[in-house]
Amino acid sequence: MGLFGLLKYAYSNRLVKHDAITTPPGIMTPIAIDLWNVMYTLMEKFDQERNFPLDGAAVTARCFFSLLRLLLKRSYYPIFVSDRGIYGDGRVKQGAKAIVSQTMSSYGGSGRLSSACFTGDEHDTEFQEDPEENDVSVPPQDTCPPTEISAGYVEPERKCEHSSTRWSALDGAPRLSYRLCVNLIRHLGYPYVNACNLEADDVCANLYHTNTVAQIYTTDTDLILMGCDIILDIMPLFPPTLRCCDVLMDLGVTYDEFLTEFVRCHTDLHEPQTLASVQSVISSLHSPPDEDEGADMPQTPSGHSWRCPNERRVISWRRQDDHDYDSSTEDSDQSDSSEEEEECPAGKGFGYRENPAVETCKRRTRPRRSAEASGRILHLKYTSRYPPIMESAPRALVRMAPPKTRHEVLERKFVKHVVSMLTPERRGSLSIMRRLPITQEPSNFSLVHDTLKNLVSEHEIARELANMFWNHIPTPTDYNTVLVNYWDDCGHRRQWS
């Protein structure tokens, strides 16, 4: 789920940091919660520890109570997000799974492949992409009001899995009660986003890049590909956190390079035979070119041809300056960077910075992180941001060669989708990025009690759960107050480090 092999790479290179909570008492950190991803993880842990049978609704209520208690202890303020809206009955029109479904559902139409691509050789089939490709530059804002839901609470679409032995498919595993979860969120008074036509990943990315939430609680690593910072687990006292800027600086690449090259590792876009691991992409990008220049260009493990047809793609470990591609470095041993950049042939219509292969081996032994990259981290009141992510995102599409195979079409459409999410609208001299609307209903504990009484089969367990929520879960603060306390800051306190 996410980027195949990214967590292994992050842990092996010590990119997962265990940070302490830095906010003072009374100041809560707003985070987005990928609801179903987190709930499935908690229910799996709870099911492994319990030694007595419980129905699915009771297990769901206990896990949700544990989640809220942990969030309170860590001073986290949750904003809940789910696929296809909070009720799970919407129809996703954007995102990785929607792109795969729309592209593969028909042989013709906007941006789809001809029937020849579905027979014979998979890797080198030519096609023409329709110029009238669906434009997703403006994310839709439609939401489903509660009054439009009658029976409601459709089971949300789950992540594509490569194994049939997942925990929820095992015999005797308790089923997640979606209706119970949604009703508890609403009646306890917690905020949520009800975007019916978006995946949870896209909603979380929108909340993150509009400076609504500081981080995202999920185990789905494709949010790193969208430039976000994620919390992997809130149970430890110092929650493990993976930041996109740490991955970029460790690899020594810009965000547009990271997006265009590592999109091959996205598990929702690729089937197992075309899916590449993060380690294989790193090895292929930093390997020296073939000695025989006249030989055909080699394929990557996922079947991708090299982006530049005449020479192999090489990214050095040295960090490139994000805002000035033609600037030279300050170090005397890197004076060769002022030479003219190599580009692909003019007929291809795209180019990017290349480094000679002889320099690549030398640069590998140098530290991957650089002072220039670290100096661009923007420290805010209680958190930090990395502006080069949004600055370099529009260059991603320029870097990509015209697609020739169906999985390259999926990659290009997904990159276009991510770029559209990260690119602000220009209105005169202003750059505007619209945040998805957040809903917060008034707290009503009578409805919480009714929900537990109606959905939990054992009345004694329902009464016990109601007492737990009543005694230990306070009424949440208005989310606008939390956002103002966390993000609002005087100009003299915002600094570059």
UniProtKB/Swiss-Prot annotation:
Key word Nuclease present: yes
Extent of Acidic residues compositional bias: 327-344
Chain intervals with Basic and acidic residues compositional bias: 309-326
Gene3D superfamilies: 5'-nuclease
Predominant location: virion
Region described as Disordered: spans on this chain: 122-142, 280-373
Compartments reported by the entry: Virion
Enzyme Commission number, as recorded: 3.1.27.-
Keyword Nucleotide-binding: no
GO BP: symbiont-mediated degradation of host mRNA; symbiont-mediated suppression of host gene expression
Matches recorded under InterPro entries: PIN-like_dom_sf
GO CC, one annotated term: virion component
Function: Minor structural protein that acts as an endoribonuclease during lytic infection. Degrades host mRNAs in the cytoplasm by cutting them at preferred sites, including some in regions of translation initiation.
UniProt family annotation: Belongs to the herpesviridae VHS protein family.
Protein name: Virion host shutoff protein
The organism of origin for this protein: Equine herpesvirus 1 (strain Ab4p)
